[in-house]
Amino acid sequence: MNEKQKLESGQVHPSDKKSEKDYSKYFEAVYIPPSLKDAKKRGKEAVTYHNDFKISEQFKGLGDGRKFYIRTYGCQMNEHDTEVMAGIFMALGYEATNSVDDANVILLNTCAIRENAENKVFGELGHLKALKKNNPDLILGVCGCMSQEESVVNRILKKHPFVDMIFGTHNIHRLPELLSEAYLSKEMVVEVWSKEGDVIENLPKVRNGKIKGWVNIMYGCDKFCTYCIVPYTRGKERSRRPEDIIQEVRRLASEGYKEITLLGQNVNAYGKDFEDMTYGLGDLMDELRKIDIPRIRFTTSHPRDFDDRLIEVLAKGGNLLDHIHLPVQSGSSEVLKLMARKYDRERYMELVRKIKEAMPNASLTTDIIVGFPNETDEQFEETLSLYREVEFDSAYTFIYSPREGTPAAKMKDNVPMRVKKERLQRLNALVNEISAKKMKEYEGKVVEVLVEGESKNNPDILAGYTEKSKLVNFKGPKEAIGKIVRVKIQQAKTWSLDGEMVGEAIEVK
């Protein structure tokens, strides 16, 4: 009698205790722990493009009468992966729910970029244990970047055996098969591919709203910064074909979307893996700017791949926004070398000069890590001086977080946590100071705002973002939601602007 027959006969319940299954085969067959040496060999394998994704007839109706809930941690790529998984769930017949208490399936789409992100997930698993105990039929899964780390999978196997399924970033398209296996088996379903996946087109999506849309243009990263786990969790760089991207953007434009963001772990390396043509992000954006959609952004950039062609195209303006996120990570050339960023302070500043020369009003934001192993006071001061020199509009700032399997995690570190926290406080004070100064310049000006909805703090106030991604709160009619309207700024705060709508609720774009 197989597992399905046992379930149907009532002899086995899907919540029965997991068996002492030997999981070693998964790691020998489809899972390899992060290895810089092994990962750098991966470029020899060709990427295959699949345009024929569809839900198998045997899985249709799998979700009838069932609800799903996905909790997402981390970056925009994860947000978009969640949209894809939601699309697959809906195609299987599931209904979405905003409550874990109502869900028949709960997925945690995880982030591995920092230890704090992982701690949040393990904390959430602890909370969900009681829910699983009270509802044994609940399917609980962990997916995303954390699942690509062998240490994480081992921890789940040992300490959270109530989890039903674990899968990674490369096999999201196999969600129907994994769900079916989870229902039919009393054992934990583990399928984590260390080999980066192929490029799968035609995946269903349930997008979050009808105003702004994410569009993946590439996957993975080949840069291997010494502190970063992403090349291991997301695989090698793989670009979608331009015709598929253009078709998707045109479809979003026809559906009324006002803004799209092109996504990639290293978005401006787009096209470098093409063997049949020379075609980069600048070429793609030069085609996308002709599509009737008001705003086009991209993230995240690596300074190493930000070329003159891209600057030339961005300078054409129009619907290509001059808000550029350009992570510097450190202002010290010595630290940048230890990070394996492959540029120094001077090269970064030269890139900033080129951008500002071509686009004088460009808005630059960045990422900065403080407390990298053995960072000296002088090296940290170089970061502060670079920040003052560039005058970034804002920055995401972090204390260095060791990631197991990365070269930096093996470095000796003589910087006490107390010093790292002090440096972060000093950096954040500078970030706030310059942000407040730049926001003050908006007072009295009229800006175009894409209205996204009601303010989180006041339902009588509308909220939206400018082309340079500044949050604007203002009074206006609900009909303005989803439109781009003019707002006169009356008061500037450190991280937001308050204003009033100019004229009637007439869309300007």
From Swiss-Prot:
<dbReference type="GO" id="GO:0005829">
    <property type="term" value="C:cytosol"/>
</dbReference>
<keyword id="KW-0004">4Fe-4S</keyword>
<dbReference type="Pfam" id="PF00919">
    <property type="entry name" value="UPF0004"/>
</dbReference>
<feature type="binding site">
    <location>
        <position position="111"/>
    </location>
    <ligand>
        <name>[4Fe-4S] cluster 1</name>
    </ligand>
</feature>
<feature type="binding site">
    <location>
        <position position="221"/>
    </location>
    <ligand>
        <name>[4Fe-4S] cluster 2</name>
    </ligand>
</feature>
<feature type="domain" description="Radical SAM core">
    <location>
        <begin position="207"/>
        <end position="437"/>
    </location>
</feature>
<dbReference type="InterPro" id="IPR005839">
    <property type="entry name" value="Methylthiotransferase"/>
</dbReference>
<dbReference type="GO" id="GO:0035600">
    <property type="term" value="P:tRNA methylthiolation"/>
</dbReference>
<dbReference type="InterPro" id="IPR007197">
    <property type="entry name" value="rSAM"/>
</dbReference>
<dbReference type="GO" id="GO:0051539">
    <property type="term" value="F:4 iron, 4 sulfur cluster binding"/>
</dbReference>
<comment type="similarity">
    <text>Belongs to the methylthiotransferase family. MiaB subfamily.</text>
</comment>
<dbReference type="GO" id="GO:0035597">
    <property type="term" value="F:N6-isopentenyladenosine methylthiotransferase activity"/>
</dbReference>
<feature type="binding site">
    <location>
        <position position="75"/>
    </location>
    <ligand>
        <name>[4Fe-4S] cluster 1</name>
    </ligand>
</feature>
<dbReference type="InterPro" id="IPR020612">
    <property type="entry name" value="Methylthiotransferase_CS"/>
</dbReference>
<dbReference type="InterPro" id="IPR002792">
    <property type="entry name" value="TRAM_dom"/>
</dbReference>
<keyword id="KW-0819">tRNA processing</keyword>
<keyword id="KW-0963">Cytoplasm</keyword>
<dbReference type="InterPro" id="IPR038135">
    <property type="entry name" value="Methylthiotransferase_N_sf"/>
</dbReference>
<keyword id="KW-0808">Transferase</keyword>
<dbReference type="InterPro" id="IPR023404">
    <property type="entry name" value="rSAM_horseshoe"/>
</dbReference>
<keyword id="KW-0411">Iron-sulfur</keyword>
<dbReference type="InterPro" id="IPR006463">
    <property type="entry name" value="MiaB_methiolase"/>
</dbReference>
<dbReference type="InterPro" id="IPR013848">
    <property type="entry name" value="Methylthiotransferase_N"/>
</dbReference>
<feature type="binding site">
    <location>
        <position position="225"/>
    </location>
    <ligand>
        <name>[4Fe-4S] cluster 2</name>
    </ligand>
</feature>
<keyword id="KW-0479">Metal-binding</keyword>
<comment type="function">
    <text>Catalyzes the methylthiolation of N6-(dimethylallyl)adenosine (i(6)A), leading to the formation of 2-methylthio-N6-(dimethylallyl)adenosine (ms(2)i(6)A) at position 37 in tRNAs that read codons beginning with uridine.</text>
</comment>
<dbReference type="InterPro" id="IPR006638">
    <property type="entry name" value="Elp3/MiaA/NifB-like_rSAM"/>
</dbReference>
<dbReference type="GO" id="GO:0046872">
    <property type="term" value="F:metal ion binding"/>
</dbReference>
<dbReference type="Pfam" id="PF04055">
    <property type="entry name" value="Radical_SAM"/>
</dbReference>
<feature type="domain" description="TRAM">
    <location>
        <begin position="440"/>
        <end position="503"/>
    </location>
</feature>
<comment type="subunit">
    <text>Monomer.</text>
</comment>
<protein>
    <recommendedName>
        <fullName>tRNA-2-methylthio-N(6)-dimethylallyladenosine synthase</fullName>
        <ecNumber>2.8.4.3</ecNumber>
    </recommendedName>
</protein>
<feature type="binding site">
    <location>
        <position position="228"/>
    </location>
    <ligand>
        <name>[4Fe-4S] cluster 2</name>
    </ligand>
</feature>
<keyword id="KW-0408">Iron</keyword>
<feature type="region of interest" description="Disordered">
    <location>
        <begin position="1"/>
        <end position="21"/>
    </location>
</feature>
<feature type="binding site">
    <location>
        <position position="145"/>
    </location>
    <ligand>
        <name>[4Fe-4S] cluster 1</name>
    </ligand>
</feature>
<feature type="domain" description="MTTase N-terminal">
    <location>
        <begin position="66"/>
        <end position="184"/>
    </location>
</feature>
<keyword id="KW-0949">S-adenosyl-L-methionine</keyword>
<dbReference type="Pfam" id="PF01938">
    <property type="entry name" value="TRAM"/>
</dbReference>
